[in-house]
Amino acid sequence: MEQVLKKMVKELEKHPKDFNIGHVILAMFYAEGGLSRARLQELLGLGEGSVKSMIKYMKKHRLISTSRAGSKLTEKGVSMLSKIRVFVPKICRISLEYLSVGKINYAAVLRGIKISEILRIRDMVVRFGGTGAVLLFYKDGSVEVPYVTNDLKSISDRDHIKICEIGPKEGDSIIIVGGEDKASTLKALGSVLLELLAHQA
């Protein structure tokens, strides 16, 4: 998986597009069961031309197939997504209060990924167009906010419930990424996920 992702990144760096590899990863999550191009635009917050270009790019790499019904992951795409899901089982939009880091917030559950440089992750999110990021740890049924509290529930019961609703398991990390709009938030989230996944087997 690492080699495939690096190859795709190099290609996009050589020939820049209106989308990045992060959008491709997120599109794979959304296109698993098949969906229309218009729906993909809505989900990713990208324009028609950008989505059209991204679909063409994904077809070139045999990740999706298209028909009148829309786009759907190929066998290769499903295989790659299953490998990604080992490390990132869930991505979703989330409504938060205390933990909010932007007008739009998205959460990703990270499993088996060791993260030691929290500030570096936050800086990376801002560099890729996001407004901020928070990294959480799920331990013994509690949500830890590093350097703040060992139990989110003691600060915001509502946010604790929202985080638990996305289904983290013991030892998981959860990254919250915020942005001004859907497109910039997902671009930042996808870029960070790519950075983390590129170092996994």
Predicted stretch roles:
Residues 69-84:
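Basic, amphipathic "hinge/linker" alpha-helix immediately C-terminal to the N-terminal HTH DNA-binding motif
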Residues 88-101:
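Long, charged amphipathic helices and adjacent flexible linkers at domain junctions
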Residues 30-36:
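Short capping segments at the starts of secondary-structure elements
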Residues 99-199:
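Mid-protein regulatory/catalytic core that forms ligand/cofactor-binding pockets
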Residues 59-69:
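A short, conserved structural fragment
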